[in-house]
Amino acid sequence: MTYLAVRNDLQLLTARELEVLQNLVNGLCPVEIAKELFISVHTARTHVKSILLKMNAHSSLEAVSLAVRNGMLPTPLTA
């Protein structure tokens, strides 16, 4: 996927989906994302599914890789 395609895909994401994607980049799973964002696990999983559809990704890892590789989101936080 090209930089422009990823950029366009990220523009389709809602603010909340971008938050969820950033948490995926930081290594959180949907259960942890739910706790972090004060939402239900079901809602977190729904956001992840929506992100995958909009980014045409087959997994969370692929979505994270596309976003980070193309410089669309900051790299994961390191300790």
Task: List PLM regions with ranges.
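Conserved short-loop catalytic and cofactor-binding motifs
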Residues: 8, 25, 36
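Basic, Lys/Arg-enriched C-terminal extension of HTH/homeodomain DNA-binding domains
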Residues: 53-79
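Recognition helix of helix-turn-helix DNA-binding domains
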Residues: 29-62
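Regulatory hinge/linker segments at domain boundaries
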Residues: 1-22, 74-76
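Hydrophobic residues on short alpha-helical segments
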Residues: 21-25, 52, 64
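Short amphipathic helical patch at the helix-1/turn junction of helix-turn-helix
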Residues: 23-25, 42, 68
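Hydrophobic alpha-helical segments, especially transmembrane helices
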Residues: 17-18, 46-50, 70
